[in-house]
């Protein structure tokens, strides 16, 4: 049985349990900005690096490569306002890594408004299915945008795919229309929460139940799987801390009876 565990205590945690065993864990951080779409201002262009440094309202300017495949965008000038997306968050002395190749994530697809390429997830391996999804993507996009079909698209009805593409495209249109009058720098689109990202990734794979200590999660996850709200310490009930500690040990025991030794 696959259980999605959502703990909203002092240190939030989202876990995927397979038959009670912790298989994957996420630690949501307040202020996560990866995937956010921003309006920034070009502060400096470095021709030798074919890159620009962009003020996005953070402590450090973001780093923006200026030559990106399939976008067809020209070089900006110092002082220009540019729509960018955070690909990697700022870390240490480095500012955020930015892109102008915006991608908007849905359950079944990624929409790329700066590209016209139609792609399919590498996890879908059957040639016939890949070809059919590409044809469906082209019919939906009509050269207006690019699409990357996710694994959840494999068995989705065409009308549902078309509806999600239209929703994502309208989201992009809202961003594009807001940019000319927005303050620089500013946020044009907030990133998905960690919970939203996990739900998007695991919904097509199947979730048997959701267990949480936060009633608000039950509302967000309604219709995905049966939800159980337990107002007690889920980390204790499901022995999460001991499982995390065990997973970090040098010697890990495998279900087959063997051991895996991990040395740094």
Question: Which stretches of residues belong to each language-model region?
Answer:
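DE-rich acidic low-complexity regions and acidic surface loops
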Residues: 1-264
């Amino acid at each position: 049985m696959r259980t999605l565990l959502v703990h909203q205590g002092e240190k939030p945690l989202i876990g995927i349990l397979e038959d009670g065993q912790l298989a994957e864990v996420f630690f949501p951080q307040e202020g996560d900005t990866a995937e956010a779409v921003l309006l920034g201002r070009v502060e400096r262009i470095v021709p030798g690096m074919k890159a620009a440094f962009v003020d996005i309202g953070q402590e450090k300017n973001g780093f923006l490569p200026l030559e990106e495949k399939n976008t067809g965008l020209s070089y900006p000038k110092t002082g220009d306002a540019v729509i960018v997306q955070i690909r990697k968050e700022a870390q240490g002395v480095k500012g955020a890594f930015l892109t102008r190749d915006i991608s908007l994530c849905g359950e079944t697809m990624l929409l790329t408004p700066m590209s016209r390429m139609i792609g399919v997830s590498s996890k879908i391996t059957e040639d016939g299915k890949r070809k059919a999804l590409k044809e469906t993507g082209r019919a939906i996009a009509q050269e207006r945008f690019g699409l990357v079909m996710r694994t959840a698209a494999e068995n989705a009805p065409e009308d549902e795919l078309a509806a999600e593409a239209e929703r994502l495209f309208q989201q992009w249109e809202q961003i594009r229309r807001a940019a000319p009058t927005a303050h620089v720098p500013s946020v044009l689109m907030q990133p998905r929460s960690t919970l939203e990202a996990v739900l998007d990734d695991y919904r097509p794979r199947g979730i048997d139940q959701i267990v949480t200590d936060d009633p608000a999660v039950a509302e967000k996850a309604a219709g995905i799987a049966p939800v159980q709200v337990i107002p007690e310490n889920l980390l204790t009930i499901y022995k999460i801390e001991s499982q995390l500690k065990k997973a970090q040990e040098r010697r890990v025991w495998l279900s087959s009876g063997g051991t895996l030794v991990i040395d740094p």
